[in-house]
Regions:
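Catalytic cores of large soluble enzymes that bind and process phosphate-bearing ligands
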Residues: 66, 70, 191, 244
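An acidic/histidine-cluster motif and surrounding catalytic segment
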Residues: 132
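Loop-rich catalytic cores of soluble enzymes, especially ATP-dependent carboxylate-amine ligases
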Residues: 107, 128, 136-243
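Terminal catalytic/cofactor-binding subdomain
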Residues: 1-121, 126-127, 213
């Protein structure tokens, strides 16, 4: 029997680290920064692909009010710790004038592998986003809901946009981040599947062909999480305000 989904919420956000006086991105984050953040947030804060980024993630939230409290605390704490290191944090999906080829990639095997595989396409990823996990415990229900929700993904992107500038220029687009991201393989709207088993066969075909190691390398705008029984919405820009993030 199909069980009613819990529709729990989990929100992940990626922030940019800048010098408060100039707004310039940090070339290399201070070694003490992440330990200081983790002393207050534990594993809710992690490094990201570039040294100038940090990522936070809420705990599993049962209500929107709980998500508001969690995300507010994460944003405030990250900003406070950054300030203690003479840095500031900005919530924006692109930096208005930074050059991507001047940024330093975080020393981590997963990121080194990504750069080795995708070269210049990966190096251009000076972008930040917001990912929202929604709890849907039944496998087939997760796939069915993915097909239904795909229709509204462009609307969510339009409501979240925060990246009109790129390399000191006005792009003419409200979300230039999505243009950068769509240069990556296996992105865009998800494929349509009739069942969880059909989705698993699709993943296994990619694995057998040597295209991906596992489902975590499928970067659709909406996907079944490979870590949790959730649907992961990945299309939106990083919202500049807490209220906008919660609205999305």
């Amino acid at each position: 029997m199909l069980t009613t989904p819990s529709f729990t919420l989990g929100i992940e956000e990626e922030y940019l680290l800048v010098h408060p006086e100039t707004g310039d991105l940090v070339g290399r984050a201070p070694e003490s920064l992440l330990p200081a953040m983790r002393s207050k947030l534990g594993d809710q804060v992690t490094r990201e692909f570039l040294q100038c980024q940090v990522e936070v993630g809420t705990r599993v939230c049962q209500t929107l009010a709980e998500a508001r409290e969690e995300l507010s605390y994460l944003r405030q704490t990250v900003a406070e710790v950054a300030s203690e290191h003479d840095l500031a944090v900005i919530a924006s999906s692109t930096h208005p004038f930074a050059e991507f080829d001047q940024q330093m990639i975080t020393d981590k095997s997963r990121y080194a592998s990504l750069e080795a595989d995708l070269q210049h396409v990966a190096r251009r990823l000076l972008i930040s986003g917001m990912h929202v996990h929604v709890g849907v415990e039944d496998d087939d229900a997760r796939i069915d809901l993915m097909s239904q929700v795909t229709y509204i993904l462009p609307h969510l992107l339009a409501l979240s946009t925060s990246s009109p500038f790129w390399r000191s220029g006005e792009t003419g687009l409200m979300s230039y981040r999505i243009c950068i991201w769509d240069e990556m393989p296996r992105t865009g709207l998800p494929s349509d599947f009739e069942s969880w088993s059909e989705y698993l066969r699709h993943v296994q075909t990619l694995v057998d062909a040597g295209i991906v190691e596992d489902a975590s390398k499928i970067w659709w705008d909406l996907r079944p999480s490979c870590r949790f029984p959730t649907l992961e919405m990945r299309i939106s820009d990083l919202c500049t305000t807490l209220e906008d993030a919660l609205c999305i």
